[in-house]
């Protein structure tokens, strides 16, 4: 008889976000970050509600465009999550 592995299977890693993905900002990841400290004391609600479009990914950062008349922003990829 073959022994069975009693370890629980590892959780699947979430799919990486790609250019064109609809995203929103994860509030808990953003609140104590360097990006939050460099911005207004209160972040606008629309970044947490989404959707924003991921325009470009460079290294650990992604450029997000919101469907509002505001400038595009660069945020760390670990602060973004899918709006789906």
UniProtKB/Swiss-Prot annotation:
Protein topology in the membrane: Peripheral membrane protein
EC numbers: 7.1.1.-
GO molecular function, a single term: quinone binding
Predominant subcellular localization, coarse grouping: membrane
Annotated keywords: Membrane, NAD, NADP, Plastoquinone, Quinone, Thylakoid, Translocase, Transport
UniProt cross-references to Pfam families, sorted A to Z: NdhO
InterPro entries, per the entry: NdhO (IPR020905)
Keyword NAD assigned: yes
Reactions performed catalytically: a plastoquinone + NADH + (n+1) H(+)(in) = a plastoquinol + NAD(+) + n H(+)(out); a plastoquinone + NADPH + (n+1) H(+)(in) = a plastoquinol + NADP(+) + n H(+)(out)
Compartment(s) where it occurs, according to its Swiss-Prot or TrEMBL record: Cellular thylakoid membrane
Record carries keyword DNA repair: no
Entry's Gene Ontology cellular component terms: plasma membrane-derived thylakoid membrane
UniProt subunit comment: NDH-1 can be composed of about 15 different subunits; different subcomplexes with different compositions have been identified which probably have different functions.
Function noted in UniProt: NDH-1 shuttles electrons from an unknown electron donor, via FMN and iron-sulfur (Fe-S) centers, to quinones in the respiratory and/or the photosynthetic chain. The immediate electron acceptor for the enzyme in this species is believed to be plastoquinone. Couples the redox reaction to proton translocation, and thus conserves the redox energy in a proton gradient. Cyanobacterial NDH-1 also plays a role in inorganic carbon-concentration.
HAMAP family: NDH1_NDH1O
Family affiliation: Belongs to the complex I NdhO subunit family.
Protein name, as recorded: NAD(P)H-quinone oxidoreductase subunit O
Lineage: Bacteria, Bacillati, Cyanobacteriota, Cyanophyceae, Synechococcales
């Amino acid at each position: 008889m073959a022994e069975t592995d009693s370890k629980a299977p590892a959780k699947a890693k979430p799919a990486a976000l790609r250019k064109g993905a609809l995203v929103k900002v994860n509030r808990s990841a953003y609140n104590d970050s360097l990006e939050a400290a460099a911005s207004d004391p209160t972040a606008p609600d629309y970044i947490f509600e989404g959707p924003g479009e991921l325009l470009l990914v460079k290294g650990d950062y992604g450029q997000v465009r919101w469907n509002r008349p505001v400038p595009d922003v660069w945020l760390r990829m670990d602060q973004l999550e899918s709006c789906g």
